[in-house]
Amino acid sequence: MLPNTGKLAGCTLFITGASRGIGKAIALKAARDGANIVVAAKTAEAHPKLPGTIYTAASEIEAAGGKALPCIVDVRDENQISAAVEKAVDAFGGIDILVNNASAISLTNTLETSMKKVDLMMGINTRGTYLTSKICIPYLKKSKVAHILNLSPPLNLNPMWFKNHCAYTIAKYGMSMCALGMSEEYKGEIAVNALWPKTAIHTAAMDMLGGSGVDKQCRKPDIMADAAYAILTKTKDFTGNFVIDEELLQQEGIKDLDVYAISPGHPLLPDFFLDESPETLASAMEEHGATAAFKAGKKQAKSQDASPLQETFKAIERSVNEEAVKSTQGIYQFVLSGEESGNWFLDLKNDKGGVGKGEPSTKADVVMSMDSGDFIKMFAGKMKPTMAFMSGKLKIKGDMGLALKLEKILGQMNAKL
């Protein structure tokens, strides 16, 4: 991991969304230098599903060697941001660094994204980043080490990253455009950069999106904290950059990236918005011996009369049991096109579960549409549902949480085949 150098000692960092996850990891890294941290987040009381509050984060920061100022801040609320900034200036004498980490996500298509969700993502991601930056800039301009760091992706205009979750992409790219515009506007005064992970990072949000078991395919928030530290300890002329965490750390001399993995050696889930297509990344993983997440099960003897699709559903049926039903509680409908078009369902909700052709007896919780050939590959472990979705080969309607559970279900099924 990247060692601390002490360069942030005495600096004041205003970090949004710092009560947990990546924001807290960045705060703790800076705290080890003896930095002052403003924990600007909404969670003041313990959440039933998400760990941490602004106060527990503050305690950890102080235990790590820093000073902490917990502030209740919803980045959509101008008054709350202004009040927190004033408290920070009163407590620490100014603000040197702003980290715009707070973010909201909904991986849903246009018709399935309510305007409430659109407003939430635009309000937190784009407007919140712009507003917090605007309020902090007068103080940042007085600092000799002024930085703004937005946790947002490179501006990749490949339509693949828009078509399945247009609203989320617009909201995240809004953060990136803030970095692009403000870096030029304040060149020489404030360094402004964006940071994005190469792979999925294990956070509470990722657990909610991917369900249990997704952690093995993720890296720890520490990799983003180290990359952020590397950026924030550079001079002001390092500005206007869209940085990828692992690429920067390799430039900084970090050779062993496995130390950041939750399960070292396990294949990693690529993050959104990067140039490599999901299929290219999957191929690269396989070339380097990463087989665990793409494991094809033991081959079954095929019936001479059964088609590949029928064989696939027979194999699925053999894996359905009460345990799978109890842990999943969902009905999947598959609308298949191509060589073997038709509707099939997987019931992991009622009684002992079941598989069949046509539509389920009760309404499906998730409807997945894709080519029958790709469906066969997906259930053979040769194509991950996440990658199929990201590349546009899989379209999803309904409960996204249940849809993301399918990856774990497939892994369990393939292990039994």
Swiss-Prot record:
Active site: Y168
The EC number(s) this enzyme carries: 1.-.-.-
Enzyme class, spelled out: oxidoreductase
UniProt-recorded name of the protein: Hydroxysteroid dehydrogenase-like protein 2
GO cellular component, one term: mitochondrion
Keyword Secreted attributed: no
CDD domains: HSDL2_SDR_c
Family (UniProt): Belongs to the short-chain dehydrogenases/reductases (SDR) family.
Gene Ontology MF terms in the entry: oxidoreductase activity
Pfam families assigned: adh_short (PF00106), SCP2 (PF02036)
Keyword list, A-Z: Mitochondrion, NADP, Oxidoreductase, Peroxisome
All copies of domain SCP2, residue ranges: 306-414
NCBIfam families reported for this sequence: PRK08278.1
Binding site for NADP(+): G17, A18, S19, R20, G21, I22, G23, K42, D74, K172
Acyltransferase as UniProt keyword: no
Biological role stated in the UniProt entry: Has apparently no steroid dehydrogenase activity. Might act as a metabolic regulator that affects systemic adaptation to nutritional cues.
Compartments reported by the entry: Peroxisome; Mitochondrion
Database matches in Gene3D superfamilies: NAD(P)-binding Rossmann-like Domain, SCP2 sterol-binding domain
Organism in which the protein naturally occurs: Xenopus laevis
